[in-house]
């Protein structure tokens, strides 16, 4: 079942945890690529020095974070890796959830080709586990780029869906690679499914 707009129009920390176990779906050239969300991070601009929109700063890049909820915020890091975020909370609130890692469900053969340019049967066990175990990796594997920035996640090309998967334990911890964020370094705003092999790190 595709998630409706009201799912995203809630406090970001609630949405973050509730996204775990849901499936990210992207239709690419007529093929359905889907993967279960296993790791996320929350970013809340008003108080979060790790957020692009800290102190409610609006720029051409961050304006999508200010709403409305349920849209994709995709940006480039290090000049080469894309990161997929989901805008949350009511219109005017700068907040989003970063999808840090996913577990492939549909289209893994195509994901392997996008990620490694070779068929799934030629991948090592380590390569398979690294297929989507990071924000940049999952964007390559699922063919997500800046073209998808601003995509309506209640639309027909990309969305999040629920399939009743909920038998897991959530781990709460600090976020990763935000050494510049001062006190926000210690915010426990990273959530992942315990013991899932596709998480980026424990």
Curated annotation (Swiss-Prot):
Keyword presence, Protein biosynthesis: no
Organism encoding this protein: Alkaliphilus oremlandii (strain OhILAs)
Record PANTHER family: DNA-3-METHYLADENINE GLYCOSYLASE
Protein name, per record: Putative 3-methyladenine DNA glycosylase
HAMAP family: 3MGH (MF_00527)
EC number(s) from the headed UniProt entry: 3.2.2.-
Organism taxonomic ancestry: Bacteria, Bacillati, Bacillota, Clostridia, Peptostreptococcales
Source domain of life: Bacteria
Family: Belongs to the DNA glycosylase MPG family.
Residues making up the signal peptide according to the UniProt record: none
């Amino acid at each position: 079942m595709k998630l409706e707009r009201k799912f995203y129009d809630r406090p970001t920390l609630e949405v973050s945890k509730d996204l775990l176990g849901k499936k990210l779906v992207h239709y690419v050239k007529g093929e359905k690529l889907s993967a279960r969300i296993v790791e996320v991070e929350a970013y809340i601009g008003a108080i979060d020095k790790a957020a692009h929109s800290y102190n409610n700063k609006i720029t051409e890049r961050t304006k999508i974070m200010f709403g409305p909820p349920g849209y994709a915020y995709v940006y480039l890091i290090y000049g080469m890796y894309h990161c997929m975020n989901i805008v949350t909370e009511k219109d005017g609130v700068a907040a989003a959830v970063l999808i840090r890692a996913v577990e492939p469900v549909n289209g893994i053969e195509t994901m392997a080709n996008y990620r490694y340019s070779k068929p799934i049967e030629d991948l090592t066990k380590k390569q398979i586990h690294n297929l989507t175990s990071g924000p940049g990796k999952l964007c390559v594997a699922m063919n997500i780029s800046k073209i998808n920035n601003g995509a309506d996640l209640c639309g027909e090309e990309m969305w999040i869906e629920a399939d009743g998967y909920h038998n897991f334990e959530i781990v709460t911890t600090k976020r990763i690679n935000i050494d510049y964020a001062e006190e926000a370094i210690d915010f426990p705003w990273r959530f992942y499914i315990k013991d899932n092999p596709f998480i980026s790190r424990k």
